[in-house]
C-alpha cells in the first residue's frame, strides 16, 4: 500500500505502512477508531460512512453519489462516467480528445456494460459503507436476486454486534462491524454468488 506523508512543505511517498515508525498494532488501531467514533458522536457528528463524519445535513453529496450507486457524468480527458447502465472513460490523450470533439469522432476509450449481478455486488459493498445500509425490498427489486441468503449472513453478524437493522428495517453495519467490513462483505458476496435469480412477476 502507499502512504503519503508531509515532510516540511514537500510531499513524500512511502512504499509501505511498515516503514512508518511506531505504527500501532491492529487491536490498538481498532480501539483508536472506536474511540474516535465515540468522541465525534458526543460532539454532534454523525458517522454517515465508514470513514466520514459530519453534522446533520452536511454530508458530502459528491461522495454519497458514488456510495449509493448513483449515475454520474465526467467531462474532459480521462474523465470517468457511469450512466445508463454503462461505465466509460474518455480518451486520456488531450490531442486525441480535442480531435474527437472537433471532428465528431469517438472520444471514448473504454466502455463496459456492467452485468446485473456485479451491480448487485457493488450495491452491497458500497451501501454497507454508509449509514443508509441495504434493504431487502430494494435489493430484490433492483437486481431480481433473493435477499434471504444475505439475511442469514447478517443475522449471524448481528450476534456479534457487527450488524443491525435501523428503524426503517434496513441492514447497517455497526462501528464494530466496520472494523471487519471486508470479511462481512466477502461473506455476503459468496452468498450472493450461490443464489438463483428471482422469477419476474
Language-model segments: residues:
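Accessory beta->alpha helical hairpin/"wing" motif in late/C-terminal subdomains of nucleic-acid enzymes
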Residues: 166-184
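A C-terminal junction/extension of Radical SAM enzymes
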Residues: 15-89
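Hydrophobic alpha-helical segments
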Residues: 131, 146, 153-160, 187, ...
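Hydrophobic alpha-helical packing residues
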Residues: 36-40, 97, 157, 184
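Short, amphipathic alpha-helical interaction segments positioned at domain boundaries
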Residues: 178-201
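Hydrophobic, secondary-structure "cap" segments at the distal end of domains
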Residues: 64-68, 74-155
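Single conserved hydrophobic/aromatic residue that forms the stacking wall/gate
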Residues: 1-8, 12-13
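A short, conserved structural fragment
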Residues: 158-168
